[in-house]
Amino acid sequence: MDFLRPASWEEALAAKAEHPAAVPIAGGTDVMVEINFDHRRPEHLMDLNRIGELSEWETGEDGVRLGASVPYTKIMEHLRAELPGLALASHTVASPQIRNRGGVGGNLGTASPAGDAHPALLAAGAEVEAESVRGSRRIPIDDFYTGVKRNALAPDELIRAVHIKKADGPQQFSKVGTRNAMVIAVCAFGIALHPSTRTVRTGIGSAAPTPIRATAAEEFLNAALDEGGFWDNGKIITPSVAKQFADLCAAACNPIDDVRGTASYRRHAVGVMARRTLTWTWESYRGARHLTEGAA
């Protein structure tokens, strides 16, 4: 196995073009486990840790450009206001040591359905900035996951950054595991309210071959909130609406039985998390709305 260590982003792109099968490594929290257990033995391993820009982020007027190697710890500490859903998901990642090393780029590159960042990225409507010597493009997160641990990257492409709009409403993340830390998700759920467009987006992890959105549940909830005037009157969401939303989220899943949980349990857990996170986010929205009205 040859070890490539580019000193710049341009060198990394050139190396990836020359060795399309080279496996990039930054935090190493996924790749090194696979190599240590002999599940993977790439001919070339590309270390990206000398490329400082991958560990940086930029906050613009409307969104955040998050470098592929920004550690989860930094997201928790510095981007909680702009990216609350991703910050909550980051807090659940493994241990402090792994949160100090791992980043969203690795989660996306591995594309495991159990990756903690995926539900939050789906709910926020993120875009993945991919680049090769041929040029750069942005891949909508909805189009990024193409199969079990497969993504939309071309063989010569690397993930440079992730673009995420600043939260314009409450976001939540919930995860079920066999313990509270150092755990691979049995299933996970993310939700984001977007008051500016009067829409709700979801993200589900570890309950289908790929991370997914519960689009039927979103469409139902968007229609129910609009028809009931909930965005304007700030009323409590009725139990029947919350239950139907939860049931549709559970129905969106296509889980398997494995050592971490059964398919039926995963569906049940997703429904519970959907109902709870909807309640939490809507209460936050109502509270913020009442504060705004009181100030006016």
Segments predicted by a language model, with ranges:
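C-terminal structural segment of proteins
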Residues: 1-296
